[in-house]
Amino acid sequence: MTTHQTPPSRPAAAGTTAPARAGRKEWTGLCVLLLPLLLVSMDVSVLYFAVPFISRDLEPSSTQQLWIFDVYGFVLAGLLITMGSLGDRIGRRRLLLIGAAAFSLASLGAAYSQSAGQLIAARAALGIAGATLMPSTLALIRNMFHDEKQRRTAIAIWTAATMSGIALGPVLSGVLLEHFWWGSVFLINVPFMVALLALAPVLVPEFRAPQAGRFDLIGSVLSLGAVVPVIYGIKEIAADGVDAVRLISIAAGLIVGAAFLVRQARARAPMIDLKLFRSRGFTGSVAMSLVAMFAIVGFAVFTTQYLQSVLGLTPLTAALWSLVPMAGTMISTPVTRLLVEHIDRAFVAAGGFAIAGAGFAALTQLHAHSPLWFLLTAAGVYAGGAIAVMAIANELIMGAVPPARAGAAAAVVETATEFGGAVGIAVLGSVGVAAYRSGLAVAAPHATPGGALAVARDTLGGAVTVAGKLPDRLGADLLEA
């Protein structure tokens, strides 16, 4: 198959060096690229409400239940660098279409799983397919939008769509489970992937690096062996605390990661060009993306707990209310695009961090009787600032690399966000738990029974449960603490 880059619709004027501007076809193609992006993002969170139904039908063990949740994210994160590099070599649209077909088949397999083992295998297959889709979409945007302003807008839309998918996952899951069986949360992927398979060959251009070299199989194995143990260890520490096995897992991943970097430095055709990290703009932007995702995911954990455990909302109602802060991202995206046309990106990014910090500071003032609007407003401010930072970071990263290296650069972006999310849950989760327990030790009513106080110290949900079993006044005082 001949590989080429489809010319943009409106070429630059003769006699100028201005890059060609994208036309209607490219913008329609962007809409097509958002389909897999939304679905892959939603599959991270779509199982939140389905677990009770899956447990009833498939009867998984506690270990199997954890793997049903986590195997998708582990495999996805571990293969992002591999798939970004593979797309540079075999063609990004080709990899996208292969991934879409595989995602559809894996979704069917997950929906009709007859055992926990089958569902775990299907979720792993979804992770493999998802890893082909995420870097392909961002890399193709780099190839489709050559004009800097248009590319900035397209990447901002891509960034907002990623976060929207994560927020929409629980809502879609809740709505489907109200009317259908648990397999419907996977079947919903199929028609959208079929639409992608039909439309992408017409609307999305093919591109592959002309001199990418041979695929580095050993480097691929090393990247998988580096990412998965580190994310596994971090997530386990966030869930159950520190122990030797989890620390060894992280250490092993870091050692393999060092071996991966050594190989990339010596390889003739590396999966990641380490020279990119000599650019302060590229390295700083990757760090910005990681920090922003670190903060977003860590804050989301507390917000969800507050809505359900403190305000007493049902999971679906909490998920619906959690969509309200997305208004902040809808406002932030176009405002950020306009600001960077007139103000240095560094100042806009700093402003985004400052806005996110203000929202976070407001969230620290929440208490048991805070009105819902206060939480949603603070969360919207926080999300808007963080999304502004991520949009700028992604645009700087993709603008800093030539089109031939866009796939590898997109994989770096995705891997950084995966690490940021995992570390955010672990670090902010641990800090939050420590602050919660410290505050409860000081403010808990003296009359609280020792056993009840121990349960309350364990989790916020435990405190709510215990408070409901105590005498009215004592229970209210415990919740207030």
Language-model-derived ranges and their functions:
Residues 156, 178-289, 295, 314, ...:
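Hydrophobic transmembrane-helix bundles of small-molecule transporters
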Residues 10-13, 195, 396, 412, ...:
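Hydrophobic transmembrane architecture of multi-pass small-molecule transporters
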Residues 50-78, 118, 316-320:
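Extracellular/periplasmic helix-loop-helix junction of adjacent transmembrane segments
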Residues 59, 91, 112-118, 180-181, ...:
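Helix-breaking motifs and short loop linkers at transmembrane-helix boundaries and internal kinks
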Residues 70-84, 134-138, 323-335:
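Central cavity-lining transmembrane alpha-helices of secondary-active solute carriers
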Residues 1-42:
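Cytosolic juxtamembrane N-terminal segment immediately preceding the first transmembrane helix
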Residues 26-42, 47-49, 245-249, 256, ...:
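12-transmembrane solute porter fold
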Residues 85-218, 236:
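Helix-loop-helix hairpins in multi-pass membrane proteins, especially solute transporters
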